[in-house]
Amino acid sequence: MAEGGFEDRELEEIRRRKLEELQKRAELERQAQIAAAQRRVALKRILTPEALARLDNIRVVRPELAEALEQQLIALASSGRVKVPIDDETLKKILEAIYSQTRREYRFRL
């Protein structure tokens, strides 16, 4: 009968750890959602509707680029290095600059 109590304690400990893990994961997800909402509010303030639509389109195709671009736009706007609101043409120029820095050129020799 002592063995049954030991197994019960083990199961209870496993359940407790699993619950803690789930709670931590839920808290991290909640924090990520809050951060995303704050970024979205900031972007709505610094981008025109057309530029925001372009950013949303980029997010569909290349989410990692959109996230990097969001961070850069927020940094540019908060430092005053770009005039707010950023219109679609300005966003295109920023994108061109990013592409020119990250684009790789391939040369084939025959």
UniProtKB/Swiss-Prot annotation:
CC annotations in GO: cytosol
MF terms in GO: DNA binding
Gene3D superfamilies recorded: PDCD5-like
Sorted UniProt keywords: DNA-binding
InterPro entries in the cross-refs: DNA_bind_arc, PDCD5-like, PDCD5-like_sf
PANTHER family for this protein: PROGRAMMED CELL DEATH PROTEIN 5 (PTHR10840:SF0)
UniProt cross-references to NCBIfam families, sorted A to Z: PRK04239.1
Assigned protein family: Belongs to the PDCD5 family.
This protein's name: DNA-binding protein Pisl_0441
